[in-house]
Curated annotation (Swiss-Prot):
This is Centractin. It comes from the Eukaryota. The keyword Nucleotide-binding applies. GO terms for cellular component: centrosome; cytoplasm; dynactin complex. Belongs to the actin family. ARP1 subfamily. Component of a multi-subunit complex, PPK2 (poly P kinase complex 2) involved in microtubule based vesicle motility. It is associated with the centrosome. PPK2 complex can synthesize a poly chain of hundreds of phosphate residues linked by ATP-like bonds. The keyword Zinc does not apply. InterPro entries: Actin, Actin_CS, ATPase_NBD. GO terms for molecular function: ATP binding; polyphosphate kinase activity. SUPFAM superfamilies: Actin-like ATPase domain. Residues 227-246 are annotated as: Disordered. GO terms for biological process: vesicle-mediated transport. The lineage of its organism: Eukaryota, Amoebozoa, Evosea, Eumycetozoa, Dictyostelia. Keywords: ATP-binding, Cytoplasm, Cytoskeleton, Nucleotide-binding.
Length: 383
C-alpha cells in the first residue's frame, strides 16, 4: 500500500512492564512517565469517599494519593499483558495525560521480541477498535535503544522491570535467531530484596509496601565487582575494615539499616540460580547471542554492546558485565560496553526519533489496512 500522511504528530508509548513512558514524536525526553500500576480499593468506604463499585480504580499519579488503601497490580508480567482490562485502563490514562483524541494521532507502541502473536493482535484490536487510532506500529525496545545511541548495528542488553533481552541488531533489523530472553529483571530483584529484608527483620507485606522496597532498591542497591570479596568484608571475624552500612528512612519515619542485601539482590541477574531459576546469567546470554550471530558480525557485536533499561542502572553494572564477558569471549577480542546515561528512557527516545523520520510513513499499519486484512497485517511490519 502506498505511504500515508498524517497531519498530527505521532504518539510514542514505551509500554514497559513497570513504567510507562509516553509523549509525542520529536520530543526529548518523554512528557509523561508513570508506574504501570492499577490500584483497586481494599475497602468499601474510606473517609468521605464512598467506594462501593468494583469498577473503581486508580492509575498513575492518582495512586499516590490513595496508596495506603489500594491493592496494586501490574497489568504486565514478564513483558506479557496478563490483565487486558487493566492494560486498557493504563492506556486510557495515558491518552488522558496527553490531552489528545486517540483517533487523531498514529501510535508507535513498544513490544518485546518473541511475545505471542495473539498478544500483539489483541493490542492492535484495542488501538484500532477501541481508540480508533488512525495508524499503529509495533517496535522492539532494544532496536529503539540502539537508534537512541546513534547506531544501527550493535547488540543491546535491555533489562527493564519485567524481562531482560539480548538483541543483536544489524542495520536496524533485529536478528531473531540470536535473540536471548531471560524472565528475570527489576521486579524479580525487588521481590528478592523484599525476601532478604524480611530475613533481616524488616517485614514489607502489602503491594503498597512492595513499592517502597522498589524505591529502596533503586536508591541503594549496586552490583558488586567481586561478590565473594564483598561477603568476606561483612563477615563478623573479618580483619578488614567494614564498609559503612547505609540507612534508609521509610515513609513512616522509621529507619532501616542495609547491608549485604544491597548487592545480593541484583546478583540474581548474573546468577539466577540464587532464586532457583535455571536461566543463564545475563553475561552468558550476551555471549551466547553473539555466538549465534553470523561469524563475520561477532567482532562488531563484541565491540558494540549497548545497555538499555532501568535495571542496567545499578552502580557497578557495566564494569561487572565487562569483566564477566571477558572471561567468556575469545582471547584478544575487543570488548566495548556503552552505557548511555539516559538509558532508562532510551527505548522511548529511539521511538521518538524513528516516528519523526519522513521515511517512517511507509511503515505504519493504517486502520484501513487493519479493516481490510484483519489482525494479521500487523505482523508484516515490525522489526
Amino acid at each position: 500500500m502506498s505511504s500515508v500522511e498524517f497531519s498530527n504528530q505521532p504518539v510514542v508509548i514505551d509500554n514497559g512492564s513497570g513504567v510507562i513512558k509516553a509523549g509525542f514524536a520529536g520530543q526529548d525526553p518523554p512528557s509523561h512517565i508513570f508506574q504501570s500500576l492499577v490500584g483497586n480499593p481494599k475497602y468499601k468506604k474510606v473517609m468521605g469517599l464512598n467506594i462501593e463499585n468494583e469498577s473503581t480504580y486508580f492509575v498513575g499519579d492518582r495512586i499516590n494519593d490513595w496508596r495506603g488503601i489500594l491493592k496494586l497490580k501490574h497489568p504486565m508480567d514478564h513483558g506479557i499483558v496478563s490483565n487486558w482490562s487493566d492494560m486498557e485502563r493504563v492506556w486510557t490514562y495515558t491518552y488522558d495525560q496527553l490531552k489528545i483524541q486517540p483517533s487523531e494521532h498514529p501510535v508507535l507502541l513498544t513490544d518485546v521480541p518473541n511475545n505471542p502473536r495473539l498478544h500483539r493482535e489483541r493490542a492492535a484490536q484495542l488501538f484500532f477498535e477501541t481508540y480508533n487510532a488512525p495508524a499503529l506500529y509495533f517496535s522492539i525496545p532494544a532496536v529503539l535503544s540502539l537508534y537512541a545511541s546513534g547506531r544501527t548495528t550493535g547488540i543491546v542488553l535491555d533489562s527493564g522491570d519485567g524481562v531482560t533481552h539480548v538483541v543483536p541488531v544489524f542495520e536496524g533489523f533485529a536478528l531473531p535467531h540470536a535473540i536471548s530472553r531471560i524472565d528475570i529483571a527489576g521486579r524479580d530483584i525487588t521481590e528478592y530484596l523484599q525476601h532478604l529484608l524480611r530475613r533481616s527483620g524488616y517485614n514489607f507485606k502489602t503491594s503498597a509496601e512492595k513499592e517502597v522496597v522498589r524505591i529502596i532498591k533503586e536508591k541503594t542497591c549496586y552490583v558488586a565487582h567481586d561478590p565473594q570479596k564483598e561477603e568476606e568484608l561483612l563477615e563478623p571475624d573479618s580483619s578488614s575494615s567494614k564498609p559503612v552500612q547505609p540507612q534508609y528512612t521509610l515513609p513512616d519515619g522509621n529507619v532501616i539499616e542495609l547491608g549485604a542485601e544491597r548487592f545480593r539482590a541484583p546478583e540474581i541477574l548474573f546468577h539466577p540460580d540464587i532464586i532457583g531459576d535455571e536461566s543463564l546469567g545475563i553475561h552468558q546470554c550476551l555471549d551466547m547471542s553473539i555466538r549465534k550471530s553470523d561469524l563475520d558480525l561477532r567482532k562488531t557485536f563484541y565491540s558494540n554492546i549497548i545497555l538499555g533499561g532501568g535495571s542496567t542502572l545499578f552502580q557497578g553494572f557495566g564494569d561487572r558485565l565487562l569483566n564477566e564477558v571477558k572471561k567468556l569471549a575469545p582471547k584478544d577480542i575487543k570488548i566495548k560496553i556503552t552505557a548511555p546515561p539516559e538509558r532508562k528512557y532510551s527505548a522511548w527516545m529511539g521511538g521518538s526519533i524513528l516516528a519523526s523520520l519522513s521515511t517512517f510513513k511507509d511503515l505504519w499499519v493504517t486502520r484501513q489496512e487493519y479493516e481490510e486484512d484483519g489482525c494479521s497485517v500487523i505482523h508484516r511490519k515490525i522489526f
